[in-house]
Every structure is written in C-alpha cells, then in structure tokens.
C-alpha cells in the first residue's frame, strides 16, 4: 500500500496530503507524522498539490484524478512513486521473483536492521520486527519488494537486484512465458551493480545467460557462489544448512525459523545480498522475525 511510501517521504521532509474513504489506525499514524488526511474523495483535496499519486484500486474517473487533470497537476500511479523512492537511496535492494518475494525482502530487512544499518523498507507483508509493512530508516539502504504484476517492477532503479524464480504467473497479462522472462530480463538490465540469481531455477538462468551483467548465484543442487550444503530437517518442516561461500572455505550454520524447504532459497538470497554488502556471517543468523509468504 501507500503507507510505507508515506513514512519514507514524510521522514525526508516532503509535504504530504491525502484522502481515504475509511478512517482507522493507519490514518491516525499518518496524521501523527504531519500528513493532512481527508476522509472521502473531493476535488478540493488536490488544490495546491505538485503531484497526485493514486493506487491501482482507484478508478480512472475518480473525482480527485479528474480535478488534477483539470488543474494541470501531474498524476502518477503508486509504482511510479515507488520507483522515485528507490532512487533516493545510495543502495536500493530490489527483490523479484514469482514466489518468495515477501519472505526474502523481510529476511534482508531483518538482517540489515539487526546489524545496525537502519534500512528503509517497502514490503508486501507485515514484518513483526518493525511492526509494519515498511519503515523509514536513516541508513543508506532501502529494501523493496519488486512485483512483476503489470510490469510494475520496471519502474524501479535497483542498485542490487534479486531474482528468486520465474514461474507461470500473471500470464493473463504477459500472454506467454517468453514475455514474462523478457520482463525479468528488462528488470535485471536496469540493475546498476549486481544481480543475485537462483542457479537452480531454469527460467531464471535462461534470462541470466543472455545478460552482459555482473551476476552472483545461489543454489542447492547446482554450482552457485552461495550454496546450501549439509541440509537437515531439524524438526518437522523446519530446515538448517551450512552456507558455503565462493570466496572462503569457512561455512556458517543457518537455522530457519520459517517452515518449508523452499525457504532455503529465500535464505540463500538473503545471505548472498547481506554478505555482499558487508555484513558478517554472524548477522545472517537473524532470520527468525521474517514474515512468511
């Protein structure tokens, strides 16, 4: 939703106003941040605004959008604003993939937070550690869940990007797997520094092999720069593994507190990103508060 973006922009000193049809705790929090929130949509609400941002749930004939058009005020969809926010930070970490985005974004945010880097975050699920769907930190990092629906992730400017997997999803929009893979290719090409990719996912690697970009891989079965070895189910449905890194013979034992073997891949992506940005191996142990997807 809009709330994490409001948190971030308010913290950076932007003057914000908005409207909603329902009152609640979120609106109370927004007002406490200094945001002027009106209940109900009204043409007068947009007077004086430099830009109007709307969510995908807002119809094109909304009275405020019509008023903005008549006043010559630019209007942009939320994903465009998210792209702008991604460029406000020195290091934007954008997590993409058909499955596992929320979990991995939460894991990376958790590790950075507990390492004292005070990241900002925009997450598709609620993260208990920060008691919300995002946060406005004071550090140089922002962690963003990058959704492929309707190509919204192509509005982002990742410094580092993650591609967890590419599976049959949103084909009603893309029309074919080929077009979906092409969208992920465009996302990867927008990455400014490093891409982290799942070497066990064929569709992901099909895309990576076409790129002239820096790529680090993570894997269980295939060769990867970051691998999970000595996997053990320490209690029903919960796994632990040794993290083997490309540049050292040392390993780190990682125990997951979120269930499911698939979360090994999400944890590997977290480990790869966090080690790359300079976190110690000990910091990778803190995944217990990550939200599951």
Kindly label every feature range from the protein language model:
Residues 32-47:
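Glycine-rich, highly charged phosphate/nucleotide-binding loops
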Residues 8-11, 28-31, 45, 56, ...:
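Phosphate-binding loop of NTP-binding sites
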Residues 286-293:
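Conserved small/polar residues in nucleotide/adenosyl-binding loops
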Residues 1-6:
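Glycine-rich adenosine-cofactor-binding loop
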Residues 16-19, 121, 217:
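Short beta-strand "acidic-cap" motif of Rossmann-like dinucleotide-binding folds
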Residues 17-27:
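NAD(P)-binding Rossmann-fold cofactor-contacting core
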Residues 258-269:
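Short glycine/threonine-rich catalytic loop with a Thr-x-Gly-x-Asp
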């Amino acid at each position: 939703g809009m709330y994490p973006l409001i948190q971030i922009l308010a913290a950076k000193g932007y003057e914000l106003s908005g409207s909603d049809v329902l009152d609640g705790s979120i609106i109370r929090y927004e007002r406490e941040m200094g945001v002027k929130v009106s209940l109900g949509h009204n043409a007068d609400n947009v007077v004086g605004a430099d830009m109007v941002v709307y969510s995908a749930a807002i119809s094109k004939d909304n009275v405020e959008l019509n008023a903005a058009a008549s006043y010559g005020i630019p209007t942009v969809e939320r994903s465009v604003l998210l792209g702008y926010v991604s460029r406000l930070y020195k290091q934007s970490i954008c997590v993409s993939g058909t499955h596992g985005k929320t979990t991995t974004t939460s894991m990376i945010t958790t590790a950075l937070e507990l390492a004292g880097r005070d990241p900002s975050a925009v997450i598709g699920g609620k993260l208990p550690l920060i008691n919300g769907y995002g946060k406005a930190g004071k550090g140089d990092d922002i962690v963003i869940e990058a959704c492929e629906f309707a190509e919204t992730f192509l509005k982002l400017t990742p410094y580092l990007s993650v591609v967890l997997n590419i599976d049959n999803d949103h084909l009603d929009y893309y029309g074919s797997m080929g077009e979906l893979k092409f969208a992920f290719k465009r996302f990867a090409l927008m990455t400014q520094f490093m891409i982290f990719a799942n070497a066990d996912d064929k569709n992901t690697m099909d895309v990576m092999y076409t790129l002239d970009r820096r790529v680090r891989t993570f894997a269980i079965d295939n060769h990867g720069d970051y691998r999970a070895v000595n996997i053990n189910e320490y209690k029903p449905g919960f796994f632990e593994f040794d993290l083997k890194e490309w540049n050292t013979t040392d390993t780190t034992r990682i125990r997951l507190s979120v269930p499911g073997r698939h979360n090994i891949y999400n944890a590997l992506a977290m480990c790869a990103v966090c080690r790359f940005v300079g976190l110690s191996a000990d910091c990778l142990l803190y995944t217990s508060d990550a939200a599951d997807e």
